[in-house]
């Protein structure tokens, strides 16, 4: 449970102050200002404990949002609420700034009254909130009985994330599979650690109350304790994509996802995150980095780095950037690269190599001679890892959308009447190779 919520500007002045529990006093406001906002050293942790009081905080631009409690609460739940609160405020009045918060403080207090009940998060869906809290934060006094019953059913009913009566001239559905691949590889090419964090984001512009079914490739198996799913797939001889953990939007019917291996749901209107997942097995590594560092005496280094793309030749990777670290006593660098542009950045102690596009099953290399200043420091250079950024048009986990179906019996439009788009985007997370 959350004891209170404070919103500060960059100076530490309180813009919004709402307390839900008697054990949170006004001194908590000053404690956060002094120990976090005005701290001599930057506070890196998002959770700060001061005098048996926990402060969970996020920062948007120059605005601080702090949830405070003296209870032992689920930190993930508190941060989920804080980020949802930011999204709701942005949906109502745009950019979260001091001016916008001051101009809409009445609206923010109304939103807090609806979102939190005695410190417990209740309803944070923007679509549901907008039905009974207007843009100006003034509740309409001219609602018919039918409109009032619609609001009541949406807030208290089973489908609180979608209002009735939505109509579009053209029914469209956009599905994005967004993945971030993280890697740590040894100089010899051995994978030390690798995992993929993924999200399925949907934009729904559908009329009525549609039923959607989303199916992933047959080989996918969600590993669960007490269920022999991995054994079953190995017996059948099929390779499996094992998802280590997975969370769904509240609109998903979990009972059907377990039994049918498909995700059934009535989607919210507009953009939302359908699911989030993580996998550590059978990852397709888009790039292999092969480093070679040779010390020529005490004042010279020779570096050669080869990158190989490991995907279909018909696909193109974009926004490729390789960062090759250099010693602190570097005096000059001469670079030769086969493709793209490379530049030594003294302020970052790194050679930055950029390539706009690169097709699959190709390789490219860069060579550099690094001149070093003489130093009395006997400690050897630690050789930080080479890092890489990129974007590829496929999912490194191997996840694929098998089907996406829409049914709306009341308005009598079928799956064939819906325009559907599916897109895969794989990006680098922390993608490093030791050298």
From Swiss-Prot:
Residues bearing PTM Phosphothreonine: 156
Changes after translation: Phosphorylation at Thr-156 increases the affinity of the AP-2 complex for cargo membrane proteins during the initial stages of endocytosis.
UniProtKB keywords: Cell membrane, Coated pit, Endocytosis, Lipid-binding, Membrane, Phosphoprotein, Protein transport, Transport
Phosphoserine PTM sites in chain numbering: 45
PROSITE patterns attached to this UniProt entry: CLAT_ADAPTOR_M_1, CLAT_ADAPTOR_M_2, MHD
Single GO term (MF): lipid binding
Membrane topology: Peripheral membrane protein
BP GO terms, sorted: endocytosis; intracellular protein transport
Cell compartments where the protein resides: Cell membrane; Membrane, Coated pit
Binding residues annotated for a 1,2-diacyl-sn-glycero-3-phospho-(1D-myo-inositol-3,4,5-trisphosphate), in chain numbering: 341, 345, 354
Domain MHD, residue spans: 170-434
Annotated InterPro entries: Adaptor_comp_med_subunit, AP2_Mu_C_sf, AP2_Mu_N, AP_mu_sigma_su, Clathrin_mu, Clathrin_mu_CS, Longin-like_dom_sf, MHD
GO CC terms in record: clathrin adaptor complex; clathrin-coated pit; plasma membrane
Keyword set includes NADP: no
Predominant place of localization: membrane
Subunit relationships: Adaptor protein complex 2 (AP-2) is a heterotetramer composed of two large adaptins (alpha-type subunit AP2A1 or AP2A2 and beta-type subunit AP2B1), a medium adaptin (mu-type subunit AP2M1) and a small adaptin (sigma-type subunit AP2S1). Interacts with ATP6V1H and MEGF10. Interacts with EGFR. Interacts with PIP5K1C; tyrosine phosphorylation of PIP5K1C weakens the interaction. Interacts with KIAA0319; required for clathrin-mediated endocytosis of KIAA0319. Interacts with DVL2 (via DEP domain). Interacts with KCNQ1; mediates estrogen-induced internalization via clathrin-coated vesicles.
Family designation: Belongs to the adaptor complexes medium subunit family.
Function: Component of the adaptor protein complex 2 (AP-2). Adaptor protein complexes function in protein transport via transport vesicles in different membrane traffic pathways. Adaptor protein complexes are vesicle coat components and appear to be involved in cargo selection and vesicle formation. AP-2 is involved in clathrin-dependent endocytosis in which cargo proteins are incorporated into vesicles surrounded by clathrin (clathrin-coated vesicles, CCVs) which are destined for fusion with the early endosome.
Protein name, per record: AP-2 complex subunit mu
Natural source organism: Pongo abelii
Classification of source organism: Eukaryota, Metazoa, Chordata, Craniata, Vertebrata
Gene name tied to this protein: AP2M1
């Amino acid at each position: 449970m959350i004891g209170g919520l404070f919103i500060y500007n960059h100076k530490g002045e309180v813009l919004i102050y709402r307390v839900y529990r008697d054990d949170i006093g006004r001194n908590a406001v000053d404690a956060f200002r002094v120990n976090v906002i005005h701290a001599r050293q930057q506070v890196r942790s998002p959770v700060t404990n001061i005098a048996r009081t926990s402060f969970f905080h996020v920062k948007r631009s120059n605005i601080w949002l702090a949830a405070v409690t003296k209870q032992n609460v689920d930190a993930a739940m508190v941060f989920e609420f804080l980020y949802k609160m930011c999204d709701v405020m942005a949906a109502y009045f745009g950019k979260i700034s001091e001016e916008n918060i001051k101009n809409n403080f009445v609206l923010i207090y109304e939103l807090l009254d609806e979102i939190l009940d005695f410190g417990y998060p209740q309803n944070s869906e923007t679509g549901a909130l907008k039905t009974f809290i207007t843009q100006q934060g003034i509740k309409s006094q001219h609602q018919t009985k039918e409109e009032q019953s619609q609001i009541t059913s949406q807030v208290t009913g089973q489908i609180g994330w979608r209002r009735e009566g939505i109509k579009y001239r053209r029914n469209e559905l956009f599905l994005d599979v967004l993945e971030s691949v993280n890697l740590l590889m040894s100089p010899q090419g051995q994978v030390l650690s690798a995992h993929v964090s993924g999200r399925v984001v949907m934009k729904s512009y559908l009329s009525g109350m549609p039923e959607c079914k989303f199916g992933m490739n047959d080989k996918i198996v969600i590993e669960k304790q007490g269920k022999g799913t991995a054994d079953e797939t190995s017996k059948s001889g099929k390779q499996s994509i094992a998802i280590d953990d997975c969370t769904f939007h509240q609109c998903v019917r979990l009972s059907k996802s377990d039994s049918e291996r498909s995700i059934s749901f009535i989607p919210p209107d507009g953009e939302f995150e359908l699911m989030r997942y993580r996998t550590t097995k059978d990852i397709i590594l888009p790039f292999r980095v092969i480093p070679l560092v040779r010390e020529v005496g005490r004042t010279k280094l020779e570096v050669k780095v080869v990158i190989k793309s490991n995907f279909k030749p018909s696909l193109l990777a974009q926004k490729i950037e390789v960062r090759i670290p250099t010693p602190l006593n570097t005096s000059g660098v001469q670079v030769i690269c086969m493709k793209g542009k490379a530049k030594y950045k003294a302020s970052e102690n790194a050679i930055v190599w950029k390539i706009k596009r690169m097709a699959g099953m190709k390789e490219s290399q860069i060579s550099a001679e690094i001149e070093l200043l003489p130093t009395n420091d006997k400690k050897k250079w630690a050789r930080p890892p080479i890092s890489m950024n990129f974007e590829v048009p496929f999912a490194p986990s191997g996840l694929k959308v098998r089907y996406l179906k829409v049914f709306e019996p009341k308005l009598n439009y079928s799956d064939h009447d819906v325009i559907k788009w599916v897109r895969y985007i794989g990006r680098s997370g922390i993608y490093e190779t030791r050298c």
